[in-house]
Every structure is written in structure tokens, then in C-alpha cells.
């Protein structure tokens, strides 16, 4: 049996002298591993992947045709390269193997396309991907109070215990016990600044470490 589609290389574990067990993320087949022989790929490569196996439960083998090397575009920027590696590792660790996740794939590709852009834009897309992944593994934000939000009293805080989002007025009395919600998480046109990005990283990091 076999399947073929575009995929993102997330990890390559050397096996023997000329092989590797390569993990990719594809739109239809999700996180998927296979044996790659006598060929080298790099984490962050977009490939045309052909997976072949005798039975569905087997590891199978890859034939990978590189279409785009995202790492090549950031090789001279160590920080961006590290962020690319971090993105791929995050996907590998949080997703369940062989589970379709076309929405995650689309969001991941959108994130990687932004990696060569302005630093604030890349950071925003990365945080949105983290938040999206958290929702997929059961740690999504509870926004039932969104109907209570107004221009003067926006959604502003997140409970670290339940993930529930509350408005500024409801959360203010407990602000020292709550996580802050950056505006761009609920308003895509919100202005980005260092403070809002720091709030975003503090929020997603808390739940990813749980």
C-alpha cells in the first residue's frame, strides 16, 4: 500500500550508515514516520512524499522529493533557524501519529511562510500556531464570556487553571493570579508590540508546560 502528498519534514533520526527514520507532517495523513534510505533531508524541508509499506501498521519507506527548503532561507540568521527547528519539534511532540490534521498543516505552512518576514509578524504567527496546537490537545481557551466583551471592557485575562477567558472588569480583581490575553489573539488586526508578544509567549508557555 502507499500514499503520496506534500509534507513537511519535522525530524530525522539516523539509522545505520545511510538511513534515517524520518517524521513528516502531511495534510491528510498527519504525523507519519518512515524509513528513508540513501538520501538526506533537512528539518523544515517541504517535500513531495511517497510512503510505501506492505501493511498499514508497518513503518514503511519514504521516497522524498524536496520542493522547498525553508531552512536555506534563514541559514544566516541563527535565531530564525532555531525558531524553525522549534516549530517543527513542537509539531512533532504535540500531535498524535497518523491522525489527519489538515487544519494544523495549513496553519503550520502559513507560519513557515512568515519566517522570512518582519520579526513581529513571525512571532505572531508562531504564537497563533502554538495556541491552535493547544486547542487540538485539549488545552484550548474557553471563550464563552466573549459575548460579554465590549470595546470598553474587552477580553483581557485567562484563568491558568481552566483556560477560561474573562473580560478586563471581571478579571481585574484577580489580575495577579491570572494570565494576560494579548489583543491579537482575539483581534487579528490588533497592533503588535513587544508587550503583547511577551504576554502571548507567557500564556502559551504556561499551558505547553502543563
Segment roles from a protein language model:
Residues 1-21, 25-210:
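Non-catalytic alpha-helical scaffolds and adjoining flexible linkers that form interface surfaces
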Amino acid at each position: 500500500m502507499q500514499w503520496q502528498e506534500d509534507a513537511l519534514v519535522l525530524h530525522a533520526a539516523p539509522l545505520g550508515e545511510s538511513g534515517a527514520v524520518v517524521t513528516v507532517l502531511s495534510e491528510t495523513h498527519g504525523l507519519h514516520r518512515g524509513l528513508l534510505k540513501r538520501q538526506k533531508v533537512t528539518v523544515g524541508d517541504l517535500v513531495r512524499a511517497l510512503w510505501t509499506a506492505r501493511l498499514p501498521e508497518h513503518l514503511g519507506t519514504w521516497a522524498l522529493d524536496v520542493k522547498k527548503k525553508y531552512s536555506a532561507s534563514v541559514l544566516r540568521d541563527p535565531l530564525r533557524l532555531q525558531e524553525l527547528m522549534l516549530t517543527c519539534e513542537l509539531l512533532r511532540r504535540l500531535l498524535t501519529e497518523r491522525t489527519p490534521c489538515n487544519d494544523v498543516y495549513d496553519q503550520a505552512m502559513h507560519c513557515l511562510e512568515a519566517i522570512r518576514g518582519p520579526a513581529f509578524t513571525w512571532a505572531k504567527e508562531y504564537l497563533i500556531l502554538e495556541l491552535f496546537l493547544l486547542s487540538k490537545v485539549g488545552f484550548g481557551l474557553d471563550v464563552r464570556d466573549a459575548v460579554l466583551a465590549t470595546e470598553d471592557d474587552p477580553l483581557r485575562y485567562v484563568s491558568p487553571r481552566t483556560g477560561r477567558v474573562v473580560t478586563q472588569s471581571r478579571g481585574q480583581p484577580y489580575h495577579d493570579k491570572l494570565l494576560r490575553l494579548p489583543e491579537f489573539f482575539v483581534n487579528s488586526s490588533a497592533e503588535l508590540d513587544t508587550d503583547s508578544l511577551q504576554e502571548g509567549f507567557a500564556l502559551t508557555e504556561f499551558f505547553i508546560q502543563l
